[in-house]
């Protein structure tokens, strides 16, 4: 072991592969971003060129970051995702992504009453994909494609596998459920515990570690582990988790185990994240949200592709309410960021959990107007994580576990660090509070 040892974490995201090399203190020694196209062939479809995003992107990231001191590598990725592959592990169908209508589950409205993410989306992905490529060698989510390209091991972690329920039943691939989709279990990827070594990265002496779901990787290095800590993940998807000591169910929200022993987290994923904000950027002219008049901002309902928690209504669509001639691009941009902040506040309040602090992580933390809007909408300071590539950093820590450089996932807490604290603005407090009430009423929230 050398003080110069580094591990690499690769995060397959919605719009790019982000990767970092990190030392034993979690200091990023190198980083790279490999962009890829997000295809929207129809309003209710969302897909990748899986070969570009899931195979070539991670290989390019490895090529840019690997060095003689690289001890291990792990991959994080969004869920759910799925493609069919040929005998060489190359994708041969579109890479289907979360929220795509091809994963629409019949009678999915029951998800409103569930306290875990709705099940069956990946099964519907598999049914469609198997119909397109019935003779494929495998049906793999993004991390399996990447891991095979990197090491020849088509492997995913248990957390990713569990999101495919009922295909994976907690102990293995369910032959009946897979057969119902036209697939045999031997064409599904191997499943292992995150943070264990399963192979060697091609052309190197580095260990391939099993990674995890992107949100889980972000969580382990965010330091939001105490009761009342709220973790806001600002990526293409907005994810809000409040740490609680005892699991409980709230209609419309998800409750899942925390990585910290004895803790749970309540909240969920929303479409009021980067996909919505990037769309606003494309259709609205230039304007600095910081220069908007606090009293002259409309209200967005940010549902350009439906909403997940707490509404679970994929057919909802966006609304811009209260627009008048006194407003400009800056006002409309501020309204978009506020909409994201309002969703954060709504998910926190619906949970009924006490709040100690808010920690923001993810690539969106680089966007100061977004962070300011979350602070203003919640009325609380926002602690912004130092490393924006949180999922990649968390994956790098899992690499350290596999390489024997760490002994416990709890040790990842020392990698958590704060870049800055964004305080709510007194000038915006009153108008933002009033717009939040309008947002709740317009969206039909139970809090209205």
Q: What are these regions, as identified by a protein language model?
A:
Residues 180-187:
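A structural motif corresponding to the C-terminal end of an alpha-helix
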Residues 8-9, 104, 108-155, 165-180, ...:
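Active-site core segments that coordinate phosphate-bearing ligands/cofactors
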Residues 67-98, 118-120, 143, 147-168, ...:
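Short beta-strand-loop/turn "lid" adjacent to the catalytic site in phosphate-handling enzymes
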């Amino acid at each position: 072991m050398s003080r110069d040892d580094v591990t690499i974490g690769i995060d397959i995201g919605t719009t790019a592969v982000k990767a970092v090399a990190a030392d034993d203190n979690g200091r990023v020694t190198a980083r790279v971003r490999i962009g890829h196209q997000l295809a929207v062939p129809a309003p209710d479809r969302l897909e990748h060129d899986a070969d570009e995003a899931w195979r070539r992107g991670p290989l390019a990231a490895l090529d840019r970051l690997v060095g003689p001191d690289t001890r291990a590598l792990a991959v994080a990725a969004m869920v759910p995702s799925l493609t069919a592959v040929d005998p060489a592990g190359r994708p041969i169908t579109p890479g289907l992504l979360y929220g795509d209508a091809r994963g629409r589950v019949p009678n999915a409205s029951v998800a409103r009453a569930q306290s875990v993410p709705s099940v069956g989306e990946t099964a519907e992905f598999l049914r469609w994909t198997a119909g397109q490529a019935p003779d494929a060698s495998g049906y793999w989510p993004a991390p399996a494609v990447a891991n095979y390209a990197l090491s020849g091991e088509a492997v995913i972690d248990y957390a990713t596998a569990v999101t495919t329920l009922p295909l994976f039943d907690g102990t293995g691939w369910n032959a009946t459920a897979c057969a119902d989709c036209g697939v045999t279990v031997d064409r599904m990827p191997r499943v292992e515990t995150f943070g264990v070594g399963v192979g060697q990265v091609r052309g190197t002496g580095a260990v391939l570690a099993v990674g995890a779901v992107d949100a889980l990787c972000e969580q382990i290095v965010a330091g939001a582990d105490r009761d009342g800590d709220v973790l806001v993940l600002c990526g293409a998807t907005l994810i809000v988790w409040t740490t609680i000591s005892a699991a409980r169910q709230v209609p419309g929200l998800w409750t899942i185990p925390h990585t910290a022993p004895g803790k749970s987290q309540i909240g969920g994923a929303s479409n009021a994240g980067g996909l919505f904000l990037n769309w606003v950027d494309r259709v609205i002219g230039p304007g600095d949200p910081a220069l908007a008049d606090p009293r002259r901002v409309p209200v967005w309902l940010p549902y350009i592709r439906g909403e997940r928690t707490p509404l679970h209504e994929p057919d909802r669509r966006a609304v811009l309410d209260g627009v008048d001639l006194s407003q400009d691009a800056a006002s409309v941009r501020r309204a978009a960021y506020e909409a994201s902040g309002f969703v954060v506040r709504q998910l926190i309040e619906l949970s009924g959990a006490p709040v100690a602090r808010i920690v923001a992580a993810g690539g969106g933390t680089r966007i100061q107007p977004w962070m300011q809007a979350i602070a203003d909408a919640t009325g609380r300071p926002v602690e912004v994580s130092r490393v924006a590539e949180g999922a990649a950093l968390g994956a790098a820590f899992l690499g350290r576990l596999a390489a024997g450089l760490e002994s416990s996932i709890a040790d990842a807490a020392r990698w958590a660090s704060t870049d800055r604290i964004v305080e709510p603005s007194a000038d915006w407090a009153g108008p933002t509070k009033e717009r939040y009430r309008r947002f709740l009423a317009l969206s039909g929230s139970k809090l209205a």
